[in-house]
Curated annotation (Swiss-Prot):
This is Putative S-adenosyl-L-methionine-dependent methyltransferase MAB_4586c. It comes from the Bacteria. One of its GO terms (biological process) is methylation. Exhibits S-adenosyl-L-methionine-dependent methyltransferase activity. Its EC number is 2.1.1.-.
Amino acid sequence: MVRTEGDSWDIVTSVGYTALAVAAGRALDAKLDPPLAHDDHAAAFVAAAGAPQLAAAVATADMTSSAAFNAQWVGVRTRFFDNFFADAAGAGVRQHVILAAGLDSRAYRLPWPAITTVFELDQPKVLQFKDEVLKRSGAQPSARRVTVAVDLRDDWPAALREAGFDATQPTGWILEGLLPYLPGAAQDALFERLNDMSAPGSRVAAELGPEPGELERLAASIKTVVGETSDGETQPNLRDLWFDDPRLDTKTWLGERGWTVTEANLVDAAVAYGRPLRDLPPAFENFLSTKFFTAVQDHPRG
């Protein structure tokens, strides 16, 4: 399904399906040595969604499946963003925002300090599905969890403020698996809004999208998000989902506005976590090596 302006999705179509594929990766990560994601809710999401190929891979712990290929890098990416939140909490940040939260369960599975609020923003149908699965399982969040049903191409800052977000307090922001799905102009606008809403001491961790022309190399290496199609299960192609149109140099842009930016290489991080990535297509290895960063707002906004 080719992306269109203002398009929407549920958990088994278009961009929503990729959140489900990531959940499958987190579920299978538990079978790797050592596991890095530690997500006890991921398998329940996959089982409830009605996506037979992913459900079968998770249920049988099929480590030869294409979903298992996802597991090795999804686990590393998950640990990277988990560590970011732990560092932010250790620095005293008590307000956190997960943009395009998908099936992220960090509000439940991370050991948050007392009086912590986690805001989750995503499409209404995605959040509804997640809430239903978590409710059936009896899961209880370890922080105050606030869901905000909004399209990030719309006025999400207004929706976030209405939900109780306090722009005078430091915030921990994560943009995990989001920016490749935004057109360049939408990404640039998102960071402008994020900067405007970030008090000194705020932090951000992000995964950037591909450069112009890079998408073709990635798509050639990884034909679909999770492998071949099967009956009744349509799996989207990266070319149909990601954007690689021109956009600002985000890291430089943030640096010019008082943020201290630190680049992150997830290939090196995997080694540090004790589980090196193996057999990655070169284009994908380059993506994991160059597209991640963290930043701290050290100075007043401007």
